[in-house]
Amino acid sequence: MRALRIGLFTDTYLPDQNGIVTSVALLADELQAQGHEVEVVAPDFPEHVETRADVRRVSSIQYVFLPTYRLAWPSRRDFDARYDLIHTHTPLTLGLSGMRLARKWKIPHVATYHTHLEAYAHYVPGAASLQKRTGFITRTAALLYGNADAVITPTAGMMDVLRAMHVKDPVVIPTSIDPRVLQAAPPVPSPWPAGTRRILTVGRLAREKRFDLVLDAVAQLPDAHLVLLGEGPERDHLQAHAERLGMAGRVTFLGVKPWREVGAYYAQAELFLFASDTETQGLVLQEAQLMGVPVVAVGARGTLSGVDDGRSGYLVPVGDVAALVRHARALLSDPALWQAMSAAARVFGASTTPQGVARQVLDVYARVLHLPPGTLSAPAQARTFTEPQPRHWEGHG
C-alpha cells in the first residue's frame, strides 16, 4: 500500500460543531488509521488551545454577521507544508487557498460539496438578493468545484446543483458516522418528564432547520414532550413560538452536550422529528436510526436518501405539518409498527461506516493520482485503531 501525505482544508472545524466538522474529523482519523499522514488546515479560535499535532491552525477573524464563527485570514507562511494531494471541504478562504496551492504545487485537488450554499445566504445581509440578481454565490462555488480534479458529494440529491456548476462526473460518497461513540455513551438523566411520549430533534437552532414546524407538530400531540438538542441563534424565537402555541411546558431546550453523551439521548427517545428542507445529507437522521429511533422527516434534497421511507421511518412533503403529526401519531400508537421500524432503523443507520467511506474516498484519490483502485487502502488487518477525537456537540445536520 502506498502512503500519502494529505491536506484536508476546511473553513469550519473544532471547537465548532456541525456536519462538516464531524465529516472531516472522522475522515482524518480513518485515513490515519489506514496508514496515511493527514494534516487538517482550519481557522484558529482565540480561546481554543490546539493539542493535536495533525491540525494546522490558520489566523482568523470574527465573522461580522455570525459572531460565533471564524473566517480564516491566511498568509503565505501558513502554508509551508507539502502534500501529495489536497482535499477541500468548504468554498471560503481556506477552500480557495487549498485550490490555489494545489494548482501552484501541481498536485491533485479533490473537493467535497457538503452544503447547499444558497440556502444559507440569509445569514449575510444582502447576500440573498445579490445571489438572486447576479448568481454570485453559485459562481464563487463553481470556481472551486468546477476546477477540482474530482468532486465528492454526500447524496444524489446534490447532483443537479453540481451539474448546474458544470461539474463533470461528481461522485456520491455518504458521510459516515462513528457508531462507537454513540453506542458507548454513558447513562444520563432523562430530560423527558415521566409518563410522556419521548420525541427528540437535534441540530443547530437556525432558521433553515425549521424547528418551528417541529414545534407546530408536537403541539398537536398532547401526550408528547419534545427535547431539542443543540444551540443556535433561533433559540429565543423558538422559545417564544412554543409560548404562543401554549406548549412551553412540553418542550425542553437541552442546549450543548458533550459528544460522548449524545448517544444516550438518542437511546432514550421514542421518535425523531425533523423538518429541515435544506440538508445535504442530514447526519442526525442517520445517528437517530443507528440508535434504533424511527424517524419522521421532511423529504427534500439530502434527506430523501437519509431515511428508508416506510421501513425505518417516514418522509413527508416540505412544510406538511399535518403529515408529520399523522405519521408520528401512528408510530406512537402502534407498538408492533414501532418495533418493526426501530429494528429497520438500526440496520439502515449502520449502512455507512468510517472505514467504508474512507476506502471510497481513497479510491477517488487513487483515480486523480492515476493509480489502480484499492492501491491506497490498507487491508483490514493492517489498520491501526485511533481513538475518535473528543468534541462537544452543538448541533449539526
Can you describe what each PLM-predicted range is?
Residues 145, 256-257, 264-269, 361:
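Short alpha-helical donor nucleotide-sugar binding micro-motif in glycosyltransferases
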Residues 22, 197-220, 233-239, 322:
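A conserved mid-protein helix/loop that constitutes part of the nucleotide-sugar donor-binding site
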Residues 239-257:
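Nucleotide-activated donor-binding/catalytic signature segment of Leloir-type glycosyltransferases, i.e.
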Residues 308-310, 314-321, 330-335, 350:
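Conserved acidic donor-binding segment of nucleotide-sugar-dependent glycosyltransferases
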Residues 285, 294-298:
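Short hydrophobic beta-strand element within catalytic cores of glycosyltransferases
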Residues 277:
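Aromatic "clamp/platform" in nucleotide-sugar-dependent glycosyltransferases that forms part
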Residues 120, 300-310, 314-315:
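Short acidic/histidine- and often glycine-rich active-site loop of Leloir-type glycosyltransferases
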Residues 42, 56, 131-185, 194:
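Donor nucleotide-sugar binding/catalytic pocket of nucleotide-sugar-dependent glycosyltransferases
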